[in-house]
Amino acid sequence: MPKQINLAGKIEKSLPPDAIALIKKAIAAAEWKDLPLYLVGGLVRDLLLGQANGNNDIDMAVEGDAVGLAVDFVEKTGGEMTAHTMFNTAKISLDKWTVDFAMARTETYERPGALPSVTPGTIQTDLFRRDFTVNAMAIGLNPAHYGELYDLYGGMKDLDKKYIRVLHANSFTDDATRIWRAIRYEQRLGFKIEPDTLQLLKRDATALKTVGGFRLRHELELVLKEPEPEKALARADELGALQELHPSLKADEWLASKFQIARRTGRASSLFYLGLLTRRMTDAEILQITKFLRLTAEQAMAIHEIRELTI
């Protein structure tokens, strides 16, 4: 049996005091309700990599009523809460932090691209439903298991190998937005998409057609918020994901040079990058992608304004 890794010291050393204070209040609420509570998501991955949590998100999984636990948490901390009862999740905005409580669950997909059907589960099933092994680890938070790492699917090994790996062969057909996430994490972390996962991604690239434009727009927005989004866009172009947004899109040396100029001249933003990405499209093509991705009025205006600029 592998040796149990405990990250209690790393939590206390790596996270800022206000984050630790919020986690401890969540632990107290969970103990009062006798609910198993776990730290999950990118924060666990980044702790193991020794990297800062760049987005100020604290994600926790609860074996039980996550919304009820979030209500008790908010009574202690304040903040603005948004609950989604269908998935038994709650998001709390508090100062600079976003705290997510989610019921540990099992997900099933009736068809490719559909939103999942959710049933209560355990931390084991909850980790298995996640996108990649490096994001499928948890840290126990209840006092009896505080700091214990739950790595059931080889996440630590893939961190060491610098691999982005799916947990099962149907991952991309279940949720094709994972194709964009694989590319984004690969470029952000300096990893490589694991060879078998890469073959699955290429096989299932057309599954992006099963995903609504609104969800694809969200993934594109996340890419455009990266420090150097041209890297992920070039990889998406290479793997065919970019063309699933619109066949005329290209991420070539011209685009990379324009993104670099935007950063040097202080104009870099996700809106400006979107305008550059679509700059070589015709009016008809811009209308098509605007409708398909359901772009906001602000995004549509940025596209047209940036076409008139000299850069």
Identify the function of each model-found stretch.
Residues 1-311:
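Catalytic cores of the polymerase beta-like nucleotidyltransferase superfamily
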